[in-house]
Amino acid sequence: MRIMSIMLHLLATILLSSAVSAQNANAASTRRLIGEDRESGRRWGVAATDLGIPYDQHNGEIGFLFGDTVSTKWVQEAKDLRSPVMLRSGIHPGEDGGIVFESAAGVDGDGLAPRLFYNGDRGDDGTGTGTWEFTVLPNDGISFPETGEHIISYLSIMNFTTPWTPNYSGLAYSTDGNTFTRLPTKWLNNDNNTDPFQMWTMQRDGDWVYVFTVRSAPQYGPLMLQRVPWDKMTNKTEYQGWGWNGEDWGWQRPCSPILDGYFGEPSVRRLHDGTWAMVYLNASTSTPHIVSRSAKDPTGPWSEEKVQVNQEGDGSLLYGGFIHPWSTSKGNQLYLMVSNWTSTSNLSQTTEAVADYEGTVSVSQFTGTL
């Protein structure tokens, strides 16, 4: 059985024997969003999935991007496997009860939420190059109210080695936020599997979109920063690196690391008060945790890490931590989407056997303070 996401492989490597307390963690679970018993499962067949990356649709709604998705609770009984899919909600996460999904991309009313764009699904990636593609997973999304266009950054996965191996990161484009087309624009992984432009998070500020990227996991590496004019995102030559030349920092240079670490998927959002927030899984030890940082500018300096979510110590695996765009820097107004893999099989088996695990995976809303 295929796993639910790349992060399961990362966490299987570093968490299988961990028993971690939740002390010193700031964010607390508010509501489980995914399941057969939730709107996601009952209305759109999104009963087990992960990620739930939220991005602003600029129409009063937030789109949530999910990875490998099935319409059954238990992965070993998987039906209707597809990735990526999108659910939407205009409900503020601070309201009583938290987020409730109200619609799905690509379907009117109720019905099976379809995948958003082509996925090779253990086959050809569709580029005509004969590239093998195990699956496609979303990195982040962004929309532009001036044109109504949406762009999703995605990851083409070749295989789930340790660390797992992407073919490339790429962009998918939509004029309506419902159906997307993969573009030729892509950032190829290198032969050493160390390219630092594979996992993306994107945030617009004025005329620029700031793109933060890391390499595939689990491996130590840099976090890089680029920017691109918002209306030229599909043109790789328009991307400007933020780099150090030995004397000072500046744009239009080869990228230099703004941070180093064992990063899971990064999430960066500019909050309404101008604060920049960053959240990611710090996988540097046998007790990884979801942490946050803040800054006044995308270039930094970034604050020290603040622990938001620790593992629960009950055999489940928590990962993600994607920032809801309506979060603020005020107390208890940092809203995070956190994935939870719960296995019903032997978690002490090798990483290579993770694909044989049995269990379920869901996404919950956590609420904390930046």
Curated annotation (Swiss-Prot):
Keywords: Glycoprotein, Signal. It comes from the Eukaryota. It holds the Pfam family DUF4185. Glycans are attached at residues 159, 167, 192, 235, 282, 340, 346. Notoamides have been shown to exhibit antitumoral activities. Notoamides A-C show moderate cytotoxicity against HeLa and L1210 cells with IC(50) values in the range of 22-52 mg/ml, but the IC(50) value of notoamide D is greater than 100 mg/ml. Moreover, notoamide C induces G2/M-cell cycle arrest at a concentration of 6.3 mg/ml. InterPro entries: DUF4185 (IPR025442), Glyco_hydro_beta-prop_sf (IPR023296). Residues 1-22 form the signal peptide. Part of the gene cluster that mediates the biosynthesis of notoamide, a fungal indole alkaloid that belongs to a family of natural products containing a characteristic bicyclo[2.2.2]diazaoctane core. The first step of notoamide biosynthesis involves coupling of L-proline and L-tryptophan by the bimodular NRPS notE, to produce cyclo-L-tryptophan-L-proline called brevianamide F. This is Notoamide biosynthesis cluster protein J.
